[in-house]
Amino acid sequence: MKYDLIIIGSGSVGAAAGYYATRAGLNVLMTDAHMPPHQHGSHHGDTRLIRHAYGEGEKYVPLVLRAQTLWDELSRHNEDDPIFVRSGVINLGPADSAFLANVAHSAEQWQLNVEKLDAQGIMARWPEIRVPDNYIGLFETDSGFLRSELAIKTWIQLAKEAGCAQLFNCPVTAIRHDDDGVTIETVDGEYQAKKAIVCAGTWVKDLLPEQPVQPVRKVFAWYQADGRYSVKNKFPAFTGELPNGDQYYGFPAENDALKIGKHNGGQVIHSADERVPFAEVVSDGSEAFPFLRNVLPGIGCCLYGAACTYDNSPDEDFIIDTLPGHDNTLLITGLSGHGFKFASVLGEIAADFAQDKKSDFDLTPFRLSRFQ
């Protein structure tokens, strides 16, 4: 049997692509080395931020606004346990922060609902937060966080119900291209399709070793927190930059535990077994202490944590491009620790590619040619 589309890697982007391509009427095969959602990639840990006024650059704003529309649509499938929670996101940092300047610029260019607060205004609205006098806050009222594992589970179930073939716990060991399309090799045999999407996350280099992606081990952890830090008390999700440039992110507390992680840093790794569990690196449990001590001093001890992996591109911008010499294979990788919020729209872009539709977005900034 020859498929219209084979998806290699059915985590964040692949799960979305499988759903949108199947919904469009294509004959799709989703594959994954594990059983998604799982703990082996970048999507576990329950929650991910979604920010609209994008500090990583204005080029992302059209993508994230479309992503939000798709997240809202997906959330309607889980109204009792919504995939998107509009908690608001407060971006904290020094007044001269380049990241916050990008947030403000994106908000202005796209007329987004962002409120600027000085240090006193931040602490008056959220007494749990402490910041120096030279800090500002940019509050995104319409942003919030996503239930990452629930989203993937929902997409996979919806795709299956729509008739998508799914081959999980079955690693793809090789990709071949010929005049008839794409063939993948797995331990279960070979499968053919007209087109392929490669969104294998951290370990894309196992299949495509020439791709400029560097896996980095990262951790996040949950700390003791009471109801003051919860959504019910209108405590927001947040990003925060310390005076030394270190960047943190976090979420409102749930079940008396507040999740926080450090965006920069981490350990460069070259194989899956190098991603050791949380607490096996000495700094894991204390990584968030500088932020907590200075900005959220009421938070208690570390309760537990987890390790994940970033698939970093050299410039930490996404890679969305066809493989050189193979226009029937789309590569989506290098999401560099800020990709999950875009999973919905990247899945839609992949489905459009499979249907020979021109993308509605300018994907030029994400081409591989920028590294040449």
Curated annotation (Swiss-Prot):
It catalyses: N(alpha)-methyl-L-tryptophan + O2 + H2O = L-tryptophan + formaldehyde + H2O2. The gene is solA. The modification S-8alpha-FAD cysteine is found at residue 308. This is N-methyl-L-tryptophan oxidase. The keyword Oxidoreductase applies. Catalyzes the oxidative demethylation of N-methyl-L-tryptophan. Its EC number is 1.5.3.-. It comes from Shigella sonnei (strain Ss046). Binds 1 FAD per subunit. It is an enzyme of class 1 (oxidoreductase). Keywords: FAD, Flavoprotein, Oxidoreductase. InterPro entries: FAD-dep_OxRdtase, FAD/NAD-bd_sf, Me_Trp_Oxase_MTOX, MTOX. The keyword Oxidoreductase applies. Signal peptide: none annotated. Its cofactor is FAD. FAD binds at residues 4-34. Monomer. It holds the Pfam family DAO. GO terms for molecular function: flavin adenine dinucleotide binding; N-methyl-L-amino-acid oxidase activity; sarcosine oxidase activity. Belongs to the MSOX/MTOX family. MTOX subfamily. GO terms for cellular component: cytosol.
